[in-house]
């Protein structure tokens, strides 16, 4: 019984597949839904920040109050847009890196919030804000409404 021989074509095909698979996987974008007011510029800028960081947003331009209530995010953590990603609620100008960390760690929680609209957070940043950055916190919101600090961003 002789050992199977590998043709040049099979070796080449296997090599190309091993290169193509990681490239294809790296291009996979994580989908989320975003509810916002159709005229909100900072919401559009936050979505652009997410899309630059590997997310694909489906935008619902009908405001976010009803979505926030339906998804269980307490009003006191409210902001100008609400998102849903892999079962987590994202409220406000949460940085993409914190959402990526949330999806990696998968804590038992409702989601994340950056209450209000702090200057310097994604979507509230850049030259139109004189590159100012106020201190703010990203909160991990539990289903019972309790919170812990997920990340802190200092004044800059």
What residues fall within each predicted segment?
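Boundary at the C-terminal end of the N-terminal hydrophobic targeting segment
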Residues: 23-25
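Short phosphate-binding/catalytic loops that engage adenosine nucleotides
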Residues: 55
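N-terminal secretory signal peptides and thylakoid transit peptides that target proteins
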Residues: 1-18
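Local sequence-structure signature of Cys/Sec-based thiol-disulfide redox active-site neighborhoods
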Residues: 30-42
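Typically the conserved alpha-helix immediately C-terminal to a functionally engaged Cys/Sec
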Residues: 46-49
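Thiol/selenol-based redox catalytic cores and closely related redox-interacting motifs
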Residues: 76-156
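Solvent-exposed loop/turn segments at secondary-structure junctions
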Residues: 39-41, 64-66, 89-90, 118-120
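Thiol-based oxidoreductase modules, predominantly thioredoxin-like and allied folds used
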Residues: 58-67, 77
